[in-house]
């Protein structure tokens, strides 16, 4: 039955169709001047950049010059790369320019599409950031597309891990900057911990195009970027509490897998109270008394560690460390640690060394970082399922770009079996059948455990001609992905590992050339071998096409339809044939959580025998409904977290703007004077209450406060005894005395030194209090949920109390700065530059799993010139580039020698 909505769409087209059609006149206009643009010489084409900038200076807008600018980029791409953007790619470029997300299928040339709006927006001179998910993609795209920009007279920079501040500053100063989302966020946080404006590396947030936008703005939205410093060791406490959990019976706690939550029952609470009392850890009489909030937090973490987190699914233990497994890619993330003590609870559970907790020095979520840009756009192959989230949180529309060639992939209905064993047996039969036909197969699993279980079963059947791609073997990842499209290849991959690389039928030409000919010098021999590889891949591609193209077999549905669509999208790129199929069982996580019992009884009634599967579109619809529920819940979680984070973000903006003003100022004497005046007003108000009699004035308290804060010994008791004296007189005398003392000190120091001292003390004090404030807000946020039991809105309570804490921070700042400045004295040595503490940065990287929890040092401490490196002492090598020759003298690249151990 066709719905009225379906009939309307057929008659008038969907809103997406209408939006795409609205760009057609511009496409036609660009095509109409193509021949004229082709007739230009290289010099004339490059000169167009100067011409466009002159038009902008005269008052023209970017939209006014879009048509000629896109035509120029298209022609430059054709001349430099041999690639001419198709009409649909022009549409993709216009979508990106109009602050929207372009959904483009795998292999449709997103990287080339980005050059069009990037060039256009870079003409403004304010800088454009192209955001990728890992260093490899940033370097690859900057090197390739930088040739087009360079041809047109524009500069291109790239930001990767390990660059010095000078290198970063130069890259950000370029017209176009390629960088990972992590590097951009960390640079922003580090910039706002600097003490001089000229030390900062970023120059603003004008326009960003985010590649794999769903991964960065959705998958990673719950995890903030954090720069932290170490706290005291509390490993004994973690071990003590961990020992309690095995003593509990199943009736002592409740587990909710859907909500990923764990709570203690009444019996469990009583048992824990006795255990804690015996250990001397319980304060007061009851576990949930306010003074036991920290202990409750530790106990809840321990329970989750034992009952919710599974080894080899959520994490693995490697080299005496608990290493997290990314739920989206199945990759190890050696750099990422769970926050709020959860990682320490897992370390206690696994009896490995417990690493100390870290205090947050600065943090920001990607949601709030990317919302700082004046203009934001994104590209991905899968965004429609999260369109509501992109619209609500980022104000970004999702527009599906038509493919250049029709998609020939066949997406078959799911096959549902009753047990894991039956499902795996059917999967292996299907893999072997496809392998015999010479059809390349990509098998997608949801965890390391499942991928290795499948691999083991295949080996038992005597089949070993396959590759496993997951967190345990990520070093081989690029090559495995490159070979996954070869006829007969069988690749078992955890989730969307290697997402940045296309699986090309016949093999990936660029990767094969780099791997096989990387060390070979340019010349006739290399050219001949390149040509041989090209011919071999052509032949292999024809065989793969004849066998039906890439066959994607999924062993389970993911919680998100988007991840399933990403997996399917690996097949059928650029009009190639392909096939995809999901094999499920009633024992799968998603099926089990969403009511497989009812389905099991239904299948039994229908007479389903062992080894048989049920295949029906209704099953697919039911599973999609379950996935939609999970997606809606996850969206609600992210939306709610953002509401809380917005409170911190508003305060962060105030602090960071204040720091920037301080850095830009050479003289803040007026600010310091205002602080001193307000401190005096607070002192007087505190000790001389409004409308109080003189006998009620607190002379002793005021004298003590003046001595402690203003460092002055004044006859306040005598003043109070004077006839007719009022609080205004007291305030005036205190102000005059403090100003006189400070003026005398300033004259002794001299203007330059005094201004330097004032700025240094204000900034260092502000930083110290801000760090304490972040910790206080974290603690407040962890307990504010309990206010809901009192019928009060936790969010409103959090906003109110966070505001009070922030007001307290500003009061403490005035008081602490005034106290320090009234006491500071010169010593006979050059003033030292204030230094930030030793810092560590970490954040989930769902594509690379690289260590982002590495210490951050000044580059001068990590970059060592080759002549100063001792080949036998790696501690003298400093930072070594991944593609540099290894300093040990082996002749290998660093990443294939000593560098191979960095991610282990």
Swiss-Prot record:
SUPFAM superfamilies: Helical scaffold and wing domains of SecA (SSF81886), P-loop containing nucleoside triphosphate hydrolases (SSF52540), Pre-protein crosslinking domain of SecA (SSF81767). The keyword Membrane applies. Its cofactor is Zn(2+). It is an enzyme of class 7 (translocase). Keywords: ATP-binding, Cell inner membrane, Cell membrane, Cytoplasm, Membrane, Metal-binding, Nucleotide-binding, Protein transport, Translocase, Translocation, Transport, Zinc. One of its GO terms (molecular function) is ATP binding. It is a peripheral membrane protein. The gene is secA. It is found in: Cell inner membrane; Cytoplasm. Its EC number is 7.4.2.8. The lineage of its organism: Bacteria, Pseudomonadati, Pseudomonadota, Alphaproteobacteria, Hyphomicrobiales. GO terms for biological process: intracellular protein transmembrane transport; protein import; protein targeting; protein transport by the Sec complex. The keyword ATP-binding applies. May bind 1 zinc ion per subunit. It catalyses: ATP + H2O + cellular proteinSide 1 = ADP + phosphate + cellular proteinSide 2. This is Protein translocase subunit SecA. One of its GO terms (cellular component) is cytosol. Part of the Sec protein translocase complex. Interacts with the SecYEG preprotein conducting channel. Has a central role in coupling the hydrolysis of ATP to the transfer of proteins into and across the cell membrane, serving both as a receptor for the preprotein-SecB complex and as an ATP-driven molecular motor driving the stepwise translocation of polypeptide chains across the membrane. ATP binds at residues 89, 107-111, 502. Belongs to the SecA family.
């Amino acid at each position: 039955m066709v719905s009225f909505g379906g009939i309307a769409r057929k008659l008038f087209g969907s809103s997406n169709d209408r939006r795409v059609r609205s760009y057609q006149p511009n496409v036609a206009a660009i095509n109409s001047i193509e021949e004229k643009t082709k007739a230009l010489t290289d010099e004339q084409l490059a000169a167009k950049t100067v011409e466009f900038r002159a038009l902008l200076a005269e008052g023209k807008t970017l939209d006014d010059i879009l048509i000629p600018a896109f035509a120029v980029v298209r022609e430059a791409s054709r001349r430099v790369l041999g690639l001419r953007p198709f009409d649909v790619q022009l549409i993709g470029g216009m979508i990106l320019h109009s602050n929207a997300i372009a959904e483009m299928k795998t292999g449709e040339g997103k990287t080339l599409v980005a050059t069009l709006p990037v060039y256009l927006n870079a003409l403004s001179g304010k800088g454009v950031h192209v955001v990728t998910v890992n260093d490899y993609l940033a370097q690859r795209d900057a090197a390739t597309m930088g040739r087009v920009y360079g041809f047109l007279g524009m500069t291109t920079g790239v930001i990767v891990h390990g660059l010095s501040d000078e290198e970063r500053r130069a890259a950000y100063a370029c017209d176009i900057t390629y960088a990972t989302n992590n590097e951009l966020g960390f640079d922003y946080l580090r910039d706002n911990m600097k003490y001089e404006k000229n030390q900062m590396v970023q120059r603003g947030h004008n326009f960003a195009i985010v590649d794999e936008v769903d991964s960065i703005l959705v998958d990673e939205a719950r995890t903030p970027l954090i720069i932290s410093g170490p706290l005291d060791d509390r490993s004994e406490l973690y071990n003590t509490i961990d020992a309690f959990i095995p003593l509990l019976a199943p009736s002592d706690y409740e587990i909710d897998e859907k909500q990923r939550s764990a709570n203690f029952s009444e019996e469990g609470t009583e048992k824990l109270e006795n255990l804690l009392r015996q250990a001397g850890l319980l304060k007061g009489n009851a576990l949930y008394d306010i003074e036991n909030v920290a202990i409750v937090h530790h106990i809840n973490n321990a329970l989750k560690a034992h009952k919710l987190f599974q080894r080899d699914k959520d994490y693995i233990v490697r080299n005496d460390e608990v290493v997290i497994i990314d739920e989206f890619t199945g990759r190890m993330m050696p750099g990422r640690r769970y926050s709020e003590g959860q990682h320490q609870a897992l370390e206690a559970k696994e009896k490995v060394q417990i690493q100390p907790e870290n205090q947050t020095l600065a943090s920001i979520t990607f949601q709030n970082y990317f919302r700082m840009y004046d203009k934001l756009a994104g590209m991905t192959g899968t965004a429609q399922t999260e369109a509501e989230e992109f619209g609500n949180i980022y104000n970004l529309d999702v527009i599906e770009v038509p493919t250049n060639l029709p998609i020939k992939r066949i997406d078959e209905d799911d096959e549902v079996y009753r047990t894991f064993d039956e499902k795996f047996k059917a999967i292996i039969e299907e893999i072997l059948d496809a392998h015999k036909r010479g059809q390349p197969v990509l098998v997608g699993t949801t965890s390391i455990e499942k991928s290795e279980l499948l691999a083991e079963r295949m080996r038992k059947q005597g089949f070993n001609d396959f590759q496993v791609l997951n967190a345990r073997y990520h070093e081989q990842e690029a090559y495995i992905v490159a070979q996954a499209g070869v006829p007969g290849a069988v690749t078992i991959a955890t989730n969307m590992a290697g997402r940045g690389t296309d699986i090309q039928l016949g093999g990936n030409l660029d990767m094969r050339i780099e791997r096989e000919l990387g060390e070979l010098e340019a010349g006739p021999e290399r050219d001949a071998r390149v040509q041989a590889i090209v011919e071999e891949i052509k032949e292999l591609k024809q065989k793969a096409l004849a066998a039906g193209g890439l066959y994607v077999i999924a062993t389970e549905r993911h919680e998100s339809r988007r991840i399933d669509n990403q997996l399917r999208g690996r097949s059928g790129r650029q009009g190639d044939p392909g096939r995809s199929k999901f094999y499920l069982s009633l024992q799968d996580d998603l099926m089990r959580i969403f009511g497989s019992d009812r389905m099991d009884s239904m299948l039994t009634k229908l007479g389903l025998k062992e080894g048989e599967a049920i295949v029906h579109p209704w099953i697919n619809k039911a599973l999609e409904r379950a996935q939609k529920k999970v997606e809606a819940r996850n969206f609600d979680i992210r939306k709610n977290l953002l509401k809380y984070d917005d409170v911190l973000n508003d305060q962060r903006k105030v602090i960071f703007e204040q720091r920037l003003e301080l850095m830009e100022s050479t003289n803040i004497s007026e600010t310091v004077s205002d602080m001193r005046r307000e401190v005096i007003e607070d002192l007087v108000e505190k000790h001389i209450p409004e409308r109080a009699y003189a006998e009620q004035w607190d002379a002793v308290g005021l004298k003590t406060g003046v001595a402690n804060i203003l460092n002055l010994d004044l006859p306040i008791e005598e003043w109070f005894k004077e006839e007719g004296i009022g609080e205004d007189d007291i305030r005036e005398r205190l102000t005059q005395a403090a100003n006189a003392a400070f003026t005398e000190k300033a004259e002794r120091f001299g203007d330059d030194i005094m201004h330097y001292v004032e700025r240094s003390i204000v900034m260092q004090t502000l930083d110290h209090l801000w760090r304490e404030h972040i910790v206080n807000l974290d603690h407040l946020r962890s307990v504010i949920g309990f206010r809901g039991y009192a019928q009060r809105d936790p969010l409103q309570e959090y906003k109110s109390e966070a505001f009070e804490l922030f007001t307290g921070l500003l009061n403490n700042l005035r008081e602490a700065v005034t106290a320090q400045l009234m006491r500071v004295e010169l010593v006979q040595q050059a003033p030292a530059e204030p230094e930030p503490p030793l810092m560590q940065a970490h954040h989930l990287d769902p594509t690379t799993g690289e260590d982002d929890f590495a210490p951050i040092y000044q580059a001068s401490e990590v970059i060592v010139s080759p002549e100063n490196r001792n080949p036998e002492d790696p501690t003298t090598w400093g930072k070594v580039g991944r593609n540099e020759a290894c300093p040990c003298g082996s002749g290998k690249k660093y990443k294939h020698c000593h560098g191979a151990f960095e991610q282990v």
